[in-house]
Amino acid sequence: MHRKAVLLEGAKMKNAQETDQWVWVVVQDPGGREQFLGQHDKLENVSYIPVFRSKEEAQQCLLNMVRRKNCKYEVQAIVFEDLAKDAAANGFMIFLLNENGEILQRIKP
């Protein structure tokens, strides 16, 4: 699952569902048993993978995400289509968030 971060800084998402679009995600335990950092919205009772338009937005929002103690986290870029396949296979939605954790778009893969 390890991906190279090749998204140009400041690139705008035209449509988060475009299959060739790169997005930024948080990866838990990179280089080991890595997996996407998922979150759970208790009000809507939905599990989701947060995605971001930029690495900086992801890094800033990571500070407020629910995380495991003593676990390493890394922001990485991934092709949206690859993420959508993994999210669908594991029962996760995808939420496009801003740096403050506000939901900009909900995507059912």
Where are these regions (language model features)?
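Conserved NAD+-utilizing ADP-ribose enzyme module
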Residues: 2-109
